[in-house]
Amino acid sequence: MFLDTSFIVALEMARDNHHNSAIVYWKKYIQKPMPLVTTDLVFAEMVTFFNARGLHAKAVEVGDRLLSSQLIDIVTITPELRAEAWSMFKRHSDKRYSLADCASFVVMRKRRISRALTFDDHFVQAGMNVAPAP
């Protein structure tokens, strides 16, 4: 399963609109954990999100947890993956996908990952299954 920024933020921020859904889903997930995949761009987005809101300690705490987790594979976006993500970004001028979204979609397709932990509607628009279900 793919781990997106929006799920991490919802899980960590009590004020987030999706916080309760994230907590309920996470409690079920940790009973039967499975490997998660994310990207270094998602990691950077998450760190930037917290730090930009004056939550440097939270950025470090969550970042350290992700980096040390045996269940989370943080994929480095190589020049080849970046080129594919950039190509996808350019093709979808009708969408509001971020480059990080496009990189996530490319990694998911290459790794045959069909489900994402996310609250970002862009994943549904791109044809991915999402959890928790919208």
Model-inferred region functions:
Residues F7-I8, E45-M46, E84:
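A general alpha-helix detector
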Residues D73-R115:
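Active-site neighborhoods of divalent-metal-dependent phosphate/nucleic-acid chemistry enzymes
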Residues T48-N51, R109:
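Short glycine/serine- and small hydrophobic-enriched flexible loop segments
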Residues M1-T38, N51-G63, P134:
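Short, well-structured N-terminal submotif of metal-dependent ribonuclease cores
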Residues D4, E45, D101, D120:
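Acidic active-site catalytic centers that drive phospho-/nucleotidyl reactions
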Residues L66-T78, W86, H92-D94, F123-P134:
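Short acidic, glycine/proline-enriched helix-loop-strand junctions
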Residues F105-P134:
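Acidic, PIN/NYN-like endoribonuclease modules and their adjacent C-terminal/linker elements
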